[in-house]
């Protein structure tokens, strides 16, 4: 009966053009997810994407093929209301702008944007222009905030030196930002990304935790583009070794441009409605690598593993003139939030892989989606699903 159920679920997703997620395949995870099992389960958080896909065949710089985009995350919708935040880098072969001020001030004052490595500058500049045009600061007499823009490298599939992300794509991602279910896989900034030897991209997940009889949400969004297939682990099963010779990456570019095994990056954004101060949010992001390690991440030399966490609690914490009173959980009670963070990161990465579809790009380079049918058989072999 369970076999029939899984089959029906997969068929229904295909016919409805809705991408399945890890739990839809029966993959087990620890912890209880929120309504959407996404970062948007944290009230006020909005996510939007702009996706750019065009061309096929040989790479002509400036012409394509293009496989890239932009993703936008707003902590409290499209209004200026800074949140407590902090960040951490497991391995710093990457970039996230604006984090120096996040560390210094303890606040995230801007939306978070994620794109490809070569488009950080244009995205940052476009966000600054949007501040002015949108009147982001409202009645605040404010002179400047530092846009937070993260990146991962999509040059295996994308004409990354063609600089195809433009201001209009940044504005489109911002305008598309909304609450509710989060689109995953080959979307937005994750369009051209790879994960653990298969196609990757954007993924999201959430957890509900109870502390002193009060429920809190931890939500995660990843732009996943890291790892070596041999390390891929799902539900504790060495899936990568089982699929080591299946649907390998097709690489037709010049040898000098070949991607090294294990290189890549991952951007992780953690949101919570639990009342946490910046130093506690630093502790939250320190737990992100646990989830990455659970699926096979190793923080390689060529990887940019950069994480940021924010709390939407304490809505009036930011004030330029007055003393404010804020709430915070005691350190002795926040271990469940650590566990929830690791769990949601792990599931978000797998969701990115499950939602991703096979994609070809420059020179016919191809990244295959992880085969759902084979994955289910492997997990059954190891008694992880019935």
Cite the ranges covered by each PLM segment:
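Alpha/propeptide regions of enzymes that mature by internal proteolysis
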Residues: 17-386
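Sec-dependent N-terminal signal peptides
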Residues: 4-13
């Amino acid at each position: 009966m369970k076999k029939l159920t899984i089959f029906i679920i997969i068929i229904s997703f295909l016919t409805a053009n809705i991408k399945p997620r890890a739990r839809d395949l029966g993959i087990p995870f620890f912890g209880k997810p929120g309504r959407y099992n996404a970062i948007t389960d944290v009230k006020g958080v909005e996510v939007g994407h702009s996706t750019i896909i065009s061309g096929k065949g040989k790479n002509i710089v400036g012409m394509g093929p293009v496989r890239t985009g932009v993703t936008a995350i707003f902590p409290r919708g499209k209004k200026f209301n800074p949140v407590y935040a902090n960040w951490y880098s497991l391995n710093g072969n990457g970039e996230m702008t604006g984090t120096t001020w996040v560390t210094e001030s303890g606040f995230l004052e801007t939306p978070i944007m994620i794109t490809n490595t070569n488009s950080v500058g244009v995205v940052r500049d476009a966000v600054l222009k949007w501040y002015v045009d949108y009147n982001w600061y409202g009645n605040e007499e404010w002179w400047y905030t530092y846009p937070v823009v993260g990146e991962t490298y999509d040059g295996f599939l994308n004409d990354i030196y063609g600089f195809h992300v433009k201001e209009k794509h940044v504005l489109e991602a911002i305008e598309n930002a909304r609450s509710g279910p989060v689109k995953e896989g080959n979307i937005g900034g994750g369009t051209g990304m790879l994960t653990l030897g298969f196609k990757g991209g954007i993924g999201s997940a959430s957890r509900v935790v109870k502390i002193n009889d009060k429920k809190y949400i931890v939500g995660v969004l990843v732009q996943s583009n890291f790892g070596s297939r041999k390390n891929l682990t799902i539900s504790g099963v060495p899936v990568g070794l089982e699929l080591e010779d299946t649907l390998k990456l097709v690489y037709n570019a010049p040898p000098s441009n070949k991607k090294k095994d294990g290189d890549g990056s991952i951007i992780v954004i953690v949101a919570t409605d639990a009342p946490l101060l910046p130093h506690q949010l630093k502790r939250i992001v320190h737990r992100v690598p646990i989830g990455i390690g659970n699926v096979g991440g190793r923080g390689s030399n060529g990887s940019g593993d950069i994480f940021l966490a924010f709390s939407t609690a304490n809505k009036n914490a930011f004030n330029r003139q007055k003393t404010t009173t804020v709430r915070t959980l005691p350190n002795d009670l926040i271990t469940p939030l650590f566990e929830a963070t690791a769990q949601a990161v792990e599931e978000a990465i797998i969701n990115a892989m499950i939602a991703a579809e096979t994609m070809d790009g420059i020179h016919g380079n191809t990244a295959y989606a992880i085969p759902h049918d084979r994955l289910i058989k492997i997990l059954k072999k190891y008694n992880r699903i019935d």
